[in-house]
Amino acid sequence: MKKLGTDLLKRGFAKMVKHGVVMDVTNVEQAQIAEDAGAAAVMALERVPADIRVQGGVARMSDPEMILEIKDAVSIPVMAKARIGHFVEAQLLESIGVDMVDESEVLTPADEVNHIDKRAFTAPFVCGARNLGEALRRIDEGAAMIRTKGEAGTGNVVEAVKHMRAVNEGIARVVGYKEMGLEAELIQMARNELKVPMELISEVAELKRLPVVNFAAGGIATPADAALMMQMGCDGVFVGSGIFKSGNPATRAKAIVEATYNFDKPAVIGEVSKNLGEAMVGINIDEIPEEKLLAKRGI
């Protein structure tokens, strides 16, 4: 019962930022711009994904002092990234009071086989997923929020779209099997394909969605990108490099918040999309060498 209560509390926090925008920030000034723009939360990190991609090297957890400075400067929740499998980085982030830990493929993985046992923490976690199997495996480990992986730092939404479609298609299969009474197929799917407990599959079949909130991330650069992902069924969006690598960060941040909230109102999205200045320079996915793709990290 204690574990269930903890899961409910963690998922409850994640629901608090539903329909909102989480913005990557690297300093206090950016965090304040994000808060003023209406961000639901900020992600504190030393380098945005676009810079990590260009500069290379090993990307690690950010300096705790920088994270604390941002926490002191804003009243909205502050998240921070830990490397995949690096449970000590997660322990440090929990100890300084971050509101949510992102076990992130943007950073260099510390463990190529295992993810963090998120049930061992009181802090909630968000994790990336490319398909239903990855999403449910992270939830089984204790994740309170899922996001598409997309391809961070590219300003190109195509991979986020691909990942959201894959999750939606997986859910549709589960629901279809359940409605047709194909219990044997569901059991086989859980055991051999998705590699998760049947209880999670049953929960997906009943809810007809993931049992936790599911945000878009990776390549969101414009208000239209944000609205696209929301119309595909996302519960909110993460924006990494797309704001502070653009020509007018404050205006673009506000516009993306408005578009996320009014995702089904094209006239509003069109209005807020005017005069935003230059968007970040994007990268075509097929121009990225296979070994440089971030979304492959963690399975």
Curated annotation (Swiss-Prot):
UniProt key word Aminoacyl-tRNA synthetase: no
Alphabetical list of CDD domains matching this protein: pdxS
Enzyme Commission no: 4.3.3.6
Top-level EC class as recorded in UniProt: lyase
Lineage top rank: taxon: Archaea
InterPro entries, per the entry: Aldolase_TIM, PdxS/SNZ, PdxS/SNZ_N, RibuloseP-bd_barrel
GO molecular function: pyridoxal 5'-phosphate synthase (glutamine hydrolysing) activity
Purpose: Catalyzes the formation of pyridoxal 5'-phosphate from ribose 5-phosphate (RBP), glyceraldehyde 3-phosphate (G3P) and ammonia. The ammonia is provided by the PdxT subunit. Can also use ribulose 5-phosphate and dihydroxyacetone phosphate as substrates, resulting from enzyme-catalyzed isomerization of RBP and G3P, respectively.
Name of this protein: Pyridoxal 5'-phosphate synthase subunit PdxS
Source organism phylogeny: Archaea, Methanobacteriati, Methanobacteriota, Methanomada group, Methanococci
Gene that specifies this protein: pdxS
